[in-house]
């Protein structure tokens, strides 16, 4: 883990602390927040800053607006946060400008200010220097607590911490990196990885990097069919990336050379199309009919996955085992989620739809750590250094 300063290392009393959080939460057309997990995840950092008598200035993006758009306002977020911290949150009209400077200048210790959506300004994603300087001028200390954006070189996460010093980690970012280190750098063995999702192409670097770090790997989801095709078996109408068949063969060979036990599903639930009304069958992996496609792992594969989970001391999970958003193809993903949650192993999960699957399985509080980052979590699994962490102050 990078040896970076945290908020524990900084004198915060009376200081204006500019905190980059990730409040990019789903909001419906009526302005209701559908899932506030990311807001709750930032509360330990915010409460620590308040206890330290700091002035807390929060900044985040929300969605992908093209300029100012009221439906992407952070007002509902400020309202929800104030409920959790039992304190008024001052909602700023913008994130830069004279009004902002006045609000910040008049703020007192233990005030909480929420800046308006950073992405109302295109300069945020361009890492514009002038925009970054204006943001940096609002604070005296910079705190990064937005793991989900740490792979992006945007102004608020990459440029501002190079201008505003000291620049340190909040508790959420620290926790993300600590759990990653426990699972991937100094793990209790055996380490078992479960990888799912639709495409090998999106997980190729993850698979290659994890093969160097894990003892066993189980590939589920539609990704499995490219590997089955690489073994010269028919996959019916299942999703296959034909341009990656040779790569899939290489991965199987690499796993053998590294002594990693490499598992594919042994049976599937197949249907004629992706819908809850399609005729379905349970078939062995080498018997998928021509006019059917694999849409979930089958009961024998679920048992195999549970057996692997039972052998693990550490589990890393990324990606669903099937089309779990459909009632008839949910069992593989949800059963694996529940088995991981009930195991004695240290479990970390994240990226893509994994968190949605865990919520649907009703085990969000039983997995040791569910990452708040999608792309950032995948980049860590790929072995990449996250640029927005490297710019923070070393201890």
Swiss-Prot record:
Q: Which GO terms describe its molecular function?
A: ADP binding; ATP binding; phosphoglycerate kinase activity
Look up keyword Kinase and say if it applies.
yes
Cellular location of this protein? Cytoplasm
Reactions this protein catalyses: (2R)-3-phosphoglycerate + ATP = (2R)-3-phospho-glyceroyl phosphate + ADP
Where does the record locate the signal sequence feature? none
Reported EC number(s) for this entry are 2.7.2.3
Q: Which Pfam families match?
A: PGK
Q: Does the keyword Kinase apply?
A: yes
Q: Which GO terms describe its cellular component?
A: cytosol
Xref: PROSITE patterns: PGLYCERATE_KINASE (PS00111)
Q: Which residues bind substrate?
A: 22-24, 38, 61-64, 119, 152
Q: What pathway is this protein said to act in by its record?
A: Carbohydrate degradation; glycolysis; pyruvate from D-glyceraldehyde 3-phosphate: step 2/5
- For the ligand (ATP), the binding residues are 203, 294, 325, 351-354
- Which GO BP terms, alphabetically? gluconeogenesis; glycolytic process
List UniProt keywords, sorted A-Z: ATP-binding, Cytoplasm, Glycolysis, Kinase, Nucleotide-binding, Transferase
Name the protein family: Belongs to the phosphoglycerate kinase family.
* Subunit organization: Monomer.
Q: What is the protein name given in its UniProt record?
A: Phosphoglycerate kinase
- Organism annotation: Hydrogenobaculum sp. (strain Y04AAS1)
Q: What is the lineage of its organism?
A: Bacteria, Pseudomonadati, Aquificota, Aquificia, Aquificales
Give the encoding gene's name: pgk
């Amino acid at each position: 883990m990078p040896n970076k300063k945290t908020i524990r290392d900084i004198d915060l009393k009376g200081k204006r602390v500019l905190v980059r959080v990730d409040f990019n939460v789903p909001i419906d057309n009526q302005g209701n927040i559908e899932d506030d997990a990311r807001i709750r995840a930032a509360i330990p950092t915010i409460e620590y800053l308040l206890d330290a008598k700091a002035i807390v200035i929060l900044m985040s993006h929300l969605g992908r607006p093209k300029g100012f758009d009221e439906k992407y306002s952070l007002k509902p977020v400020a309202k929800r946060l104030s409920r959790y911290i039992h304190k008024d949150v001052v909602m700023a009209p913008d994130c830069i400008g004279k009004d902002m400077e006045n609000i910040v200048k008049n703020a007192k210790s233990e005030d909480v200010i929420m800046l308006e959506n950073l992405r109302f300004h295109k300069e945020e994603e361009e890492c514009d220097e002038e925009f970054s300087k204006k943001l940096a001028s609002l604070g005296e200390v910079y705190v990064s607590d937005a793991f989900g954006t740490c792979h992006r070189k945007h102004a608020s996460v990459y440029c501002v911490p190079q201008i505003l010093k000291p620049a340190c980690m909040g508790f959420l970012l620290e926790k993300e990196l600590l759990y990653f280190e426990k699972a991937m750098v100094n793990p209790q063995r055996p380490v078992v990885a479960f990888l799912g999702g639709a495409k090998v192409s999106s997980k190729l670097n993850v698979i290659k990097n994890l093969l160097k770090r894990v003892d066993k790997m189980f590939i589920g989801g539609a990704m499995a069919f490219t590997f089955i095709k690489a073994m010269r078996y028919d996959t019916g109408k299942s999703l296959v990336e034909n341009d990656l068949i040779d790569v899939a063969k290489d991965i199987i060979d690499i796993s053998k050379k590294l002594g990693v036990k490499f598992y594919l599903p042994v049976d599937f639930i197949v249907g004629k199309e992706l819908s809850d009304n399609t005729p379905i069958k349970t078939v062995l992996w080498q018997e998928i009919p021509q006019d059917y496609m694999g849409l979930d792992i089958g009961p024998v594969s679920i048992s195999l996955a549970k057996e692997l989970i039972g052998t693990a001391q550490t589990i890393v999970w990324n990606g669903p085992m099937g089309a779990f958003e459909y009632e008839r193809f949910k069992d593989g993903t949800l059963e694996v989620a529940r088995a991981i949650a009930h195991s004695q192993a240290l479990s970390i999960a994240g990226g893509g739809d994994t968190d949605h699957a865990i919520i649907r399985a009703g085990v969000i509080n039983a997995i040791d750590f569910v990452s708040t980052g999608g792309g950032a979590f995948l980049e860590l699994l790929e072995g990449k250094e996250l640029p927005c962490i490297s710019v923070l102050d070393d201890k």
